[in-house]
């Protein structure tokens, strides 16, 4: 356990006074930190020989692959001639199908056709979003060790696949498309993920790449990749752009500045469970209710009927982007009854209006986080097939006071295009040597300190990769081990944030509290993957943890809740912080006085003086024990001032008797960093 304890009372100590020497020994080392923000392999001489590196947009509903060759970026078509490939995997009695072939037989083989796997990857089975999603999936999802597994029948036998395996199959398909085009083997790739994918989801995506035989060199946020596609030809004046990425299953918004080939992410927000699939589900539910009302038949329990309805609902949604009404016709839909209904654009918009409006909240958030106004935005870039919906465009343009969104890039292909450019940077392709990508992390990362306080090491919207270190110490005398509890979130107290993982550093040499120095380092790489280490500065012993994909990171609902609650309860959080800091400062000060009086100063103090100081120490410790939960920050500060007033003259006299040449006692010194934070 850590405690964030910093002294608000400084002692101006003569260099010859033993008491001041003691304090000098336990003064904190200045916090060290480095932030390597301008990172992305930049020039040809910096890259390894990876061969041709491909860029893959691994989407919820569709995936896309691109490659940079001879300075030009190509979006590659599959064997059907399509430049986007359905993220579907299906098993028949004879074979495994991936892409268009799998999607085309989904209605007739719903139990063995897997889609929307991106909504399960990197999440635990008991995650509320997983539980919500599996209710609407026709295939079976089972629980194994609190991890979702997909169960299908393969050649007459039950077979279970992890989301990583299924995603690996889709990545393998993209790899094959690239190899067919290039005529050679491909081993390295850049893969995109939603900006709000957490560490577990990113790790799982890298694992999927390994399953597909791909070394994923870089995980790039989807809106950032789209910004590269949009901004390659805008290399002079600075542009502030909003990338609005509404895909099949996820939604991201990023605010970037582009100038002289530098793409800097200012802020990012989003929802990993919002997209075209949700709009489809609204239609499916609407049509199922209409059918039940007309025929008194519930089709929701019939997987084949629901798969047919889903297929036609998606077609209807797409057609309504270019026309105002469409008709859904399904022969022998259920129990031999045909299905026939008309859907207008107005009805589609009515059913989904709440979801459309929900996308504006992250837009407001990135503006607030970056400190910019609507008027400061130069361009709005639309990414993802769902941005073709007229109502979505209308709401977004209205939000920006009538500013028209840019339609200069294909929303289905922009992310893969940007990924291919980044791949070209890594493989040393000509023409992209000067591109620099500055991305950010989505949530604050920190550790628990005494009192359950969240002590941040890497703040939200920090440019990545980055590395930050801070010195901590022990919370009790002769503490032999410390447990490092790693959290993500925006609240002041760890109970309101999400635990990512923990580990223990043991065999610390016995010493009074506050003396050992434990250096904790957070390293967040360019893929957004976190490694935490702790080193005992005395012995050199070190332990570390990489937050891996089995740690159960946050769902998007949790992320949204954290940010909203952080804003809503900002005053409460500030009060908690102030109270905790004041309590820790007072308690630390009392213990240091106690240890000093019983230690080096014991031989030079009068017994009466020593007794007086220790009486004050014991009275203060008793007060702390009785009042820590109920006292406010002001109470701790008052007790601190009273304690200091009582003991300071006595300690100053002891220092003077030791041979202080200055004859000075103690003076207030504006120094908030007298003591190390404690473990």
Curated annotation (Swiss-Prot):
Q: Does the keyword ATP-binding apply?
A: yes
Catalysed reaction equations from the record: ATP + H2O = ADP + phosphate + H(+)
**Regulation of this protein's activity per its record:** The chaperone activity is regulated by ATP-induced allosteric coupling of the nucleotide-binding (NBD) and substrate-binding (SBD) domains. In the ADP-bound and nucleotide-free (apo) states, the two domains have little interaction. In contrast, in the ATP-bound state the two domains are tightly coupled, which results in drastically accelerated kinetics in both binding and release of polypeptide substrates. J domain-containing co-chaperones stimulate the ATPase activity and are required for efficient substrate recognition.
Cellular compartment(s): Endoplasmic reticulum lumen
Q: Tell me any Pfam family this protein matches.
A: HSP70
Region forming the signal peptide: 1-43
- Stretches of Acidic residues bias are at 665-679
What keywords tag this UniProt record? ATP-binding, Chaperone, Endoplasmic reticulum, Hydrolase, Nucleotide-binding, Signal, Stress response
Superkingdom of the source? Eukaryota
In short, the EC number is 3.6.4.10
Q: Where is this region: Nucleotide-binding (NBD)?
A: 147-301
Per the record, the similarity remark reads: Belongs to the heat shock protein 70 family.
In UniProt terms, what function does this protein have? Answer: Probably plays a role in facilitating the assembly of multimeric protein complexes inside the ER. Is required for secretory polypeptide translocation. May physically associate with SEC63 protein in the endoplasmic reticulum and this interaction may be regulated by ATP hydrolysis.
What is the name of the protein in this document? Endoplasmic reticulum chaperone BiP
Organism, scientific name: Kluyveromyces lactis (strain ATCC 8585 / CBS 2359 / DSM 70799 / NBRC 1267 / NRRL Y-1140 / WM37)
Q: What's the name of its gene?
A: GRP78
């Amino acid at each position: 356990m850590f405690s964030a304890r910093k002294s608000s009372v400084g002692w101006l100590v003569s260099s010859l006074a033993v008491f001041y020497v003691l304090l000098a020994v336990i003064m904190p080392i200045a916090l060290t930190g480095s932030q390597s923000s301008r990172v992305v392999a930049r020039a040809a001489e910096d890259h390894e020989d990876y061969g041709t590196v491909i860029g893959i947009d691994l989407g919820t509903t569709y995936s896309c692959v691109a490659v940079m060759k001879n300075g030009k970026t190509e979006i590659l078509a599959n064997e059907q001639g399509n430049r986007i490939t359905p993220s579907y995997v299906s098993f028949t009695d004879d074979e495994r199908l991936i892409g268009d072939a799998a999607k085309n037989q989904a209605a007739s083989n719903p139990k063995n056709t897997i889609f929307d796997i991106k909504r399960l990857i990197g999440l635990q089975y008991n995650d509320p979003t997983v539980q919500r999603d599996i209710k609407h999936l026709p295939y079976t999802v089972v629980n194994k060790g609190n991890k979702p597994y997909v169960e299908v029948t393969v050649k007459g036998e039950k077979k279970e696949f992890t989301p990583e395996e299924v995603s690996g199959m889709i990545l393998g398909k993209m790899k094959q498309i690239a190899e067919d085009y290039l005529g050679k083997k491909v081993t390295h790739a850049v893969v995109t993920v939603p900006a709000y994918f957490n560490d577990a989801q990113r790790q799982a995506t890298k694992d999927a790449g390994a399953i597909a035989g791909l070394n994923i060199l870089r995980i790039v946020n989807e809106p950032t990749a789209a910004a590269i596609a949009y901004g390659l030809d805008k290399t002079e004046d600075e542009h502030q752009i909003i990338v609005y990425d509404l895909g099949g299953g996820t939604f991201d918004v990023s605010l970037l500045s582009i100038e002289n080939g530098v793409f800097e992410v200012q802020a990012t927000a989003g929802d990993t469970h919002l997209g075209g699939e949700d709009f489809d589900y609204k239609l499916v539910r609407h049509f199922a209710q209409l059918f039940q009302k007309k025929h008194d038949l519930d089709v929701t329990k019939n997987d084949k009927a629901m798969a047919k309805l889903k297929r036609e609902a998606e077609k209807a949604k797409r057609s309504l982007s270019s026309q105002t009404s469409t008709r859904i016709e399904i022969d022998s839909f259920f129990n031999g009854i045909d299905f026939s209904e008309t859907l207008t654009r107005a009805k589609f918009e009515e059913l989904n209006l709440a979801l459309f409006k929900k996308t504006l909240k992250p837009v407001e958030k990135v503006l607030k986080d970056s400190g910019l106004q609507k008027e400061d935005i130069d361009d709005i870039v639309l990414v993802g097939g769902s941005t073709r919906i007229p109502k979505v465009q209308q709401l977004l343009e209205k939000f920006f006071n009538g500013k028209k969104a840019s339609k200069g890039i294909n929303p289905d292909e922009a992310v893969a295009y940007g990924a291919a450019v980044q791949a070209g940077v890594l493989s040393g392709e000509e023409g992209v040597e000067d591109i620099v990508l500055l991305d950010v992390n989505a949530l604050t990362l920190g550790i628990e300190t005494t009192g359950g306080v969240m002590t941040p090491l890497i703040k939200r919207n920090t440019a990545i990769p980055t590395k930050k270190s801070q010195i901590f110490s022990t919370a009790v005398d002769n503490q032999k081990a410390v447990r490092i509890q790693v959290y993500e979130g925006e609240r002041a107290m760890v109970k309101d944030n999400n635990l990512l993982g923990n580990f223990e550093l043991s065999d610390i040499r016995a010493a009074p509290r506050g003396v050992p120095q434990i250096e904790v380092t957070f390293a967040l790489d360019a893929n957004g993957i976190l490694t935490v280490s702790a080193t005992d500065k005395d012995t050199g012993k070190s332990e570390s943890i990489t937050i891996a994909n089995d740690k159960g990171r946050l769902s998007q609902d949790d992320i949204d809740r954290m940010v909203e609650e952080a804003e809503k309860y900002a005053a409460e959080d500030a009060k908690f912080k102030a109270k905790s800091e004041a309590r820790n400062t007072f308690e630390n000060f009392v213990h240091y006085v106690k240890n000093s009086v019983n230690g080096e100063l014991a031989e030079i103090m009068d017994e009466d003086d020593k007794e007086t100081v220790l009486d004050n120490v014991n009275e203060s410790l008793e007060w702390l024990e009785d009042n820590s939960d109920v006292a406010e920050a002001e109470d701790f500060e008052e007790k601190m001032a009273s304690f200091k007033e009582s003991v300071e003259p006595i300690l100053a006299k002891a220092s003077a008797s030791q041979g202080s040449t200055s004859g000075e006692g103690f003076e207030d010194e504006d120094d908030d960093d007298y003591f190390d934070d404690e473990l």
